[in-house]
Amino acid sequence: MSTTTQNIPWYRHLNRAQWRAFSAAWLGYLLDGFDFVLIALVLTEVQGEFGLTTVQAASLISAAFISRWFGGLMLGAMGDRYGRRLAMVTSIVLFSVGTLACGFAPGYITMFIARLVIGMGMAGEYGSSATYVIESWPKHLRNKASGFLISGFSVGAVVAAQVYSLVVPLWGWRALFFIGILPIIFALWLRKNIPEAEDWKEKHAGKAPVRTMVDILYRGEHRIANIVMTLAAATALWFCFAGNLQNAAIVAVLGLLCAAIFISFMVQSTGKRWPTGVMLMVVVLFAFLYSWPIQALLPTYLKTELAYNPHTVANVLFFSGFGAAVGCCVGGFLGDWLGTRKAYVCSLLASQLLIIPVFAIGGANVWVLGLLLFFQQMLGQGISGILPKLIGGYFDTDQRAAGLGFTYNVGALGGALAPILGALIAQRLDLGTALGSLSFSLTFVVILLIGLDMPSRVQRWLRPEALRTHDAIDGKPFSGAVPFGSAKNDLVKTKS
């Protein structure tokens, strides 16, 4: 940027069309967050009505994560082939229909299937909305684009918590899911009133359709084998997370089978850059493992261990959700200032100072607990707002929606595992201790993976001929693309 451009406030670098594109995507993501977290709010009510165990109840949260990898792949490929806008609208319709089905569910299996549909829609919304906004904004503002957008999910969670406190005591838990059908009206408006993403239009202007991940996996020479592996992965995940298996060894074997299938898909679709894709899935896996025990089971912790009533639960969840929303925006500013990876590491390190006090303070002082949760979620959860930008930078435009959607949502299986891990540990410890210890320990893994830029580093170790040295979104260099000390030595040579 020129000196003159740098002196202009950041928001003046955006025109009306770019703001409209962002606003539409942000509202879509808000509705996504609203629909998705409803199950966490009414988990105890559903558990009581259906007579579920704690692990079975937690698996209803996990169900949406089980289908996300496939939704991210399919709807991401739709976004790469036909445009980000169509994929975004389709995603909203999917998760809205799934939410309505939850309201009519007569039992556990039906609700589990409805949650699978929600997961597919959520995955598509994440990948399509994120690429849509990031590709519509100027390069030097794309961390802000990512962070501001993802804040919509947390705002949706806050709105859902407030609606829960008003609706459920009067009309029961099913009424909450009936409200979730409203996003379809918004989807119809989106289809007519928002432009296509600029990067996608420039890349595809006058050119033949791109070969998407769906084309490679399900229309290529290995399509039969890939269809069989897809069914095998879906079946394995069903048995792992539907509460049907009690043998940890069998679950571990099925988990390894799924991992092998997903790695195979990544190798086929990304070629020599598969080490980067696999490591991105690992990064996201641990990002969900550290954050989602709290996201999924915090309402249960507040209602059972702290004995809060629905109104107090809603107030505490407001602090938590609002903190995450503010953190997404703060993360956007930090990312554009410090760089994406450095901002991520600094924010997570600061959040570690708060995670133990959150679960050690107890429930005597609601306001202190709410304040601690606000800052912990702002620093620990909010920084994930720039995760789409971090992942998207490793993929070219014509593969970005599917690449982001697939890697992110395969890694998001950590979100399926997280509440079940928390519930299992809580059978031996109290739930607060289980949530705090999981989050505290696994956050350090994410700090190392992102701080050391392991996707680029492992790519350099295994397939250096396909190494990308600079971020495809903002053009900044990847620190893991060069050995330790090389950049410093180059700087010394330049000065001399």
From Swiss-Prot:
Q: GO CC annotations?
A: plasma membrane
Query: What membrane topology does the annotation report for this chain?
Result: Multi-pass membrane protein
Q: Which residues cross the membrane?
A: 22-42, 58-78, 92-112, 116-136, 148-168, 170-190, 224-244, 247-267, 278-298, 313-333, 353-375, 406-426, 431-451
* Keywords assigned by UniProt, alphabetized: Cell inner membrane, Cell membrane, Membrane, Sugar transport, Transmembrane, Transmembrane helix, Transport
Catalytic activity reads: N-acetylneuraminate(in) + H(+)(in) = N-acetylneuraminate(out) + H(+)(out)
Write down a Pfam family by its short name: MFS_1
Disulfide bond positions: none
Gene3D superfamilies from the UniProt entry: MFS general substrate transporter like domains
Protein's name in the database:
Sialic acid transporter NanT
